Swiss-Prot record:
<feature type="transmembrane region" description="Helical">
    <location>
        <begin position="80"/>
        <end position="100"/>
    </location>
</feature>
<keyword id="KW-0444">Lipid biosynthesis</keyword>
<keyword id="KW-1003">Cell membrane</keyword>
<keyword id="KW-0808">Transferase</keyword>
<dbReference type="GO" id="GO:0005886">
    <property type="term" value="C:plasma membrane"/>
</dbReference>
<comment type="function">
    <text>Catalyzes the transfer of an acyl group from acyl-phosphate (acyl-PO(4)) to glycerol-3-phosphate (G3P) to form lysophosphatidic acid (LPA). This enzyme utilizes acyl-phosphate as fatty acyl donor, but not acyl-CoA or acyl-ACP.</text>
</comment>
<dbReference type="GO" id="GO:0043772">
    <property type="term" value="F:acyl-phosphate glycerol-3-phosphate acyltransferase activity"/>
</dbReference>
<dbReference type="InterPro" id="IPR003811">
    <property type="entry name" value="G3P_acylTferase_PlsY"/>
</dbReference>
<comment type="pathway">
    <text>Lipid metabolism; phospholipid metabolism.</text>
</comment>
<protein>
    <recommendedName>
        <fullName>Glycerol-3-phosphate acyltransferase</fullName>
        <ecNumber>2.3.1.275</ecNumber>
    </recommendedName>
</protein>
<dbReference type="Pfam" id="PF02660">
    <property type="entry name" value="G3P_acyltransf"/>
</dbReference>
<feature type="transmembrane region" description="Helical">
    <location>
        <begin position="144"/>
        <end position="164"/>
    </location>
</feature>
<keyword id="KW-1133">Transmembrane helix</keyword>
<feature type="transmembrane region" description="Helical">
    <location>
        <begin position="168"/>
        <end position="188"/>
    </location>
</feature>
<keyword id="KW-0812">Transmembrane</keyword>
<comment type="similarity">
    <text>Belongs to the PlsY family.</text>
</comment>
<feature type="transmembrane region" description="Helical">
    <location>
        <begin position="6"/>
        <end position="26"/>
    </location>
</feature>
């Protein structure tokens, strides 16, 4: 019964992740498929760069909310059936981010998972999430590179989990870090060769 409950929670969280805010916003505002615009990524940064601040903010907030809701729904369901709420929450984090990054409904072409990771982890472990967010803001403020801030910010999460001796959280943090690095591999290459765009920099 417990295993079945966790499977249901995982599936529901993954399906929530499949709700692509960027796709919906781009279709509503500009009538375009965001995957054919800019970098081709179905994420808030690409929406911001191609459709403007309003659309970018809507996408970012939608992705964050999606992560929060996945965890809250999972923890509520866990309480109802009497299973571990923390484990259910962490499982939801992994699955909602996986659903966002690799959505079945969009041919497994999704976003990079930063905003959804932020929302999901904020719901399950707010203190560490805010610490990672502070690192992100600091790195972006200094370098003007959103991609670098994303990688470094989430990359700090395993370190923070080790510091507080949170083994379950460490596993989730390692997954999030690996997925963000993987999805930012093109950005990392551009950072290394000096061609990555900074905030406000126009595409040449």
């Amino acid at each position: 019964m417990e295993i079945f409950s966790y499977i249901i929670i995982a599936v529901v969280a993954y399906l929530l992740g499949n709700i692509s805010t960027s796709y919906i916003v781009a279709k509503r505002i500009a009538g375009v498929d965001i995957r054919t615009q800019g970098s081709g990524n179905a994420g808030s940064t690409n929406v911001l760069r191609t459709l403007g601040k309003r659309a970018g903010a809507m996408t970012f907030l939608g992705d964050v909310l999606k992560g929060v809701m996945a965890v809250l729904i999972s923890e509520f369901a866990a309480r109802l059936v009497g299973i571990d709420t923390l484990l259910a929450g962490y499982l939801a984090v992994i699955c909602v981010v996986a659903g966002h990054n690799w959505p079945a409904v969009l041919g497994f072409r999704g976003g990079k998972g930063v905003a959804t990771s932020l929302g999901a982890m904020l719901a399950v472990n707010p203190v560490i999430t805010l610490m990672c967010l502070a690192v992100f803001i600091l790195v972006v403020a200094i370098t003007k590179y959103v991609s670098l801030g994303s990688v470094v910010g989430i990359g700090c999460s395993p370190i923070f989990m080790i510091m507080v001796k949170n083994k379950a959280g460490l596993i989730v943090a390692l997954f999030l870090t690996a997925s963000v690095i993987y999805n930012h591999r093109a950005n990392i290459k551009r950072l290394l060769n000096g061609t990555e765009r900074k905030i406000g920099q126009k595409k040449e």
